[in-house]
């Protein structure tokens, strides 16, 4: 596995593979890798000839009161997992490499971001599409791999790829979970022992919501209340940041219960904010 830190070396390495007619699979990450990331790598390994992973904690998607400096980083751990997983190139740029000068232009997301994380984190998704535009141009992948856990991000990135004609096939992979149902996340390390024991209730609540919808329930307030009551059975969380239903991928109010629906949750614990979701009537790509 090659570890590359600058744009020019990456471009040259990618061009060499393109000249050999190799297909490129790309897994963008912010590091502190876990099994969820490696599942994306596994899919890329099976479906493409050459796998590139980036590890870059992107400052432009963090708000002024968010945890950019505290975000967990462990390059040695990431490199070990990436190599064991079959990554061919690990791209680990500095902030200066990706943002060498102040931006002269700005990408602004106007749809799919007025609710959930988009509402709570102003400018977050602008930062996401900005860095992915840069990285997509550098890696020039055939396939790019994302996890369903970040479903709103997936919807936003799908819009980016469609709007700007990126010749990239987005592959959306099911959320990887612990044995007790908790979605794998780099932020799980911040949970106390009691919080970690109780956090799987988020997934349990979402499953309840799914069951209600699939049984024909269309009273949104009732569905949300049942899920809220379930989460509140385990009192270690500080608050429920959101628990809501929307059409997917539009993130507008549900008007047709036979089409794509997302049930999404964000729950705040003492040092971690965990997100999870269930997609209904949605085929993964």
From Swiss-Prot:
EC number annotated for this UniProt entry: 6.3.2.1
Catalytic residue positions: 37 (proton donor)
Pathway: Cofactor biosynthesis; (R)-pantothenate biosynthesis; (R)-pantothenate from (R)-pantoate and beta-alanine: step 1/1
Alphabetically ordered keywords of this record: ATP-binding, Cytoplasm, Ligase, Nucleotide-binding, Pantothenate biosynthesis
Keyword Ligase applies: yes
Protein name: Pantothenate synthetase
InterPro entries named among the record's database cross-references: Cyt_trans-like, Pantoate_ligase, Pantoate_ligase_C, Rossmann-like_a/b/a_fold
Pfam families with a match to the protein in the record: Pantoate_ligase
Classification via Gene3D superfamilies: HUPs, Pantoate-beta-alanine ligase, C-terminal domain
Keyword Nucleotide-binding: yes
Organism: Listeria monocytogenes serotype 4b (strain F2365)
GO biological process terms on file: pantothenate biosynthetic process
Main location (coarse class): cytoplasm
Top-level EC class: ligase
Chain positions recorded as (R)-pantoate binding sites: 61, 153
GO MF assignments: ATP binding; pantoate-beta-alanine ligase activity
Residues reported in the UniProt entry to bind ATP: 30-37, 147-150, 176, 184-187
Family annotation (SUPFAM superfamilies): Nucleotidylyl transferase
Entry function: Catalyzes the condensation of pantoate with beta-alanine in an ATP-dependent reaction via a pantoyl-adenylate intermediate.
Catalytic activities: (R)-pantoate + beta-alanine + ATP = (R)-pantothenate + AMP + diphosphate + H(+)
Sequence similarity: Belongs to the pantothenate synthetase family.
Additional information: The reaction proceeds by a bi uni uni bi ping pong mechanism.
HAMAP family associated with the record: PanC
Gene Ontology cellular component annotations, sorted alphabetically: cytosol
Subunit structure: Homodimer.
UniProt-annotated location(s): Cytoplasm
Binding site for beta-alanine: 61
